[in-house]
UniProtKB/Swiss-Prot annotation:
Forms part of the ribosomal stalk, playing a central role in the interaction of the ribosome with GTP-bound translation factors. HAMAP family: Ribosomal_uL10 (MF_00362). Belongs to the universal ribosomal protein uL10 family. This is Large ribosomal subunit protein uL10. It holds the Pfam family Ribosomal_L10. The gene is rplJ. Transmembrane segments: none annotated. PROSITE patterns: RIBOSOMAL_L10.
Amino acid sequence: MSLNRSEKEAVINEVTSLAAKAQTLVIAEYRGITVADMTKLRSDARSKGVSLSVLKNTLARRAVAGSQFDVVADQMTGPLIYGFSEDAVAAAKVVADFAKTNDKLVIRGGAFAGKALDVNGVKQLANIPSKEVLLAQLCGLLMSPISRTAVVLGALAAKKSEGSAEEPAAEAVAA
C-alpha cells in the first residue's frame, strides 16, 4: 500500500511528536512473527505505556531527524518495529521480555538519552527496575532506620515493664 504525500507527512508528524515526548526508542526486527504474536506484543506494550509502530524506514528516519533518536538512523533497515516510551525502561522491558519467548522478534538496537544502544545495551536497560519499583526501594531505605528505632524503643519499653514487674515479686519472696 503506497501512501500519498499528505499521508506520509501525517505519519512523520505523528512519529515526530512521539519522539519528542519519548525518553527511549527500541528497534526490533519482526520478520516471520505471527499476527497473533504481534497483537499480543502490541497489547502488552499499550498496557505499559509503550507506543509500537511498524513504519517505513525512510519515514522513520525523517521523523527522528534532529531529535535525540537521530543517532540510530543508520540502524533503520529491514522490517522493523519501533517502540517509543516516556518511561526510560518500559520500551526496552516490553520488547526484551517478548523476545525471550519469541525468537522471531530480534532486538536490533535503540537509543536512550541521545546515545545509541546496541542489543546488549537494550537488554541492560530492560533489566533496570521501573521508576515505581526504584521509588519503593528508596522509601524502604529511608524508612528502615525509623522502623529499627521504633523496634528498639519497643523492646526497651517491654524490658523495662518486665523489670518493674519482677521487683515486687522479688520483695514478696524476701518477706
